[in-house]
């Protein structure tokens, strides 16, 4: 059995100053942020930029020094932080990958931005790449 990946949802880019980098991306590419959201429980603020026929670009900055993205920025500087795949069912994907020996950053999926359910695969499981799995909130 394998998990059902629907698409690459977004590419997360870690930035130190969200407002500054968002203005730069908007100027360079002529797009506006579709969404800007604070996630204080995760210690991050993010802005999502939509491009035609492409994954979203998610700019992510820390709200505090304890946020995982703050540690990433201190160790590696700004740049690509993660790739996100949409999955059909986050719970079954999580359980299936655990059976295959995949290590996760969290103990279980949790609520992400916009009411989605997410979980991160630890970089040591996939050659140093942080992968987010995301199940979108059901559309009403």
Identify what each model region corresponds to.
Residues 1-20, 78-87, 137-140:
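N-terminal beta-strand motif that seeds the catalytic metal site of vicinal oxygen chelate
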Residues 3-4, 37, 47-50, 57, ...:
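Vicinal oxygen chelate
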Residues 8-15, 25, 49, 54-60, ...:
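Short, structured motif recognition centered on aromatic/hydrophobic residues
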Residues 21-26, 97:
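Conserved active-site tyrosine of GNAT-family acetyltransferases
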Residues 27-33, 101-103:
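Conserved acetyl-CoA-binding loop of GNAT-fold acetyltransferases
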Residues 66-68, 112:
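Serine-centered coil/turn micro-motif
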Residues 72-100:
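Mid-chain, well-packed structural core segment of small domains
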